[in-house]
Amino acid sequence: MKHIPRKRFGQHFLADQSVLDRIVQLIDPQPGEALVEIGPGLGAMTDPVVERCKRLTVVELDRDLAARLRKRPELTVIESDVLKVDFTALAQAAGRPVRVIGNLPYNISSPILFHLLEQVASVQDQHFMLQKEVVDRMASAPGSKDYGRLSVMLQWRYQIESLLDVPPESFDPPPRVDSAIVRMLPLAQPPAVDPKLLGELVTVAFSQRRKMLRNTLGRWLEAREHGGAFDLTRRAEEVPVAEFVALTMAIQQTPSNSPLTAGATPDAA
């Protein structure tokens, strides 16, 4: 029986074989690797991937699709909301970091990316189909209109590369937006920064992105007793990722912002 895509799950199934072939080529799955596919759907990407790697773990929320997938012995099916999946446990069970792939539901793509960011130490790499606008934001450089919180929060921990643009007609049903394939490689030696503090800083900095940082970040820094040098006569979109990270690390050195005290009085900003 034909599966009808469910709007509430953001289902748009990739149907263009030439695009599928190119995606699998870019992923280059190998036997013995611990691959996890998010949202396998009807198996368009699943089939050529598992043909190469022989075993595959899939995460599928749609119970009807999960039931179909369970009939395949080469697949380990996790019927769950991906935001509840413990990728660290999957890596530990496999005895190696996981490679995460998938055509992500566009309506929850950012929460999925941040869920994986929290477990990035257990990830070898990530290859995703996403809304092109999101990929552009993920990979953008300072000074670009697309550069923002998402750019900083992912680039401090990943090397990000947009690999391939995919038009709407490659899907069934076609989405209303263009899509793109992105590759995310965790940095081998990431800076020793507190992700929560960095996230708070970046959120404040970009809260009014057209204003000078002295009007947004200035008070936040004062509240944290930061007296170091940082140019506040810029807009947030002009500040490189490395500077946001360095500023966060400097704030971490302030006694009142140490891990033992930083969470005691959360800032209302």
Swiss-Prot record:
Segments forming a coiled coil: none
Residues where S-adenosyl-L-methionine binds: H12, L14, G39, E60, D81, N103
UniProt cross-references to InterPro entries, sorted A to Z: KsgA/Erm, rRNA_Ade_diMease-like_C, rRNA_Ade_Mease_Trfase_CS, rRNA_Ade_methylase_Trfase_N, rRNA_adenine_dimethylase, SAM-dependent_MTases_sf
Keyword Ubl conjugation belongs to the record: no
Record keyword Acetylation present: no
Catalytic activity: adenosine(1518)/adenosine(1519) in 16S rRNA + 4 S-adenosyl-L-methionine = N(6)-dimethyladenosine(1518)/N(6)-dimethyladenosine(1519) in 16S rRNA + 4 S-adenosyl-L-homocysteine + 4 H(+)
UniProt-listed PROSITE patterns: RRNA_A_DIMETH, SAM_RNA_A_N6_MT
A Pfam family per the record: RrnaAD
EC number: 2.1.1.182
Main localisation: cytoplasm
UniProt-listed NCBIfam families: ksgA
Function: Specifically dimethylates two adjacent adenosines (A1518 and A1519) in the loop of a conserved hairpin near the 3'-end of 16S rRNA in the 30S particle. May play a critical role in biogenesis of 30S subunits.
Family according to the record: Belongs to the class I-like SAM-binding methyltransferase superfamily. rRNA adenine N(6)-methyltransferase family. RsmA subfamily.
Stated name of the protein: Ribosomal RNA small subunit methyltransferase A
Species annotation: Leptothrix cholodnii (strain ATCC 51168 / LMG 8142 / SP-6) (Leptothrix discophora (strain SP-6))
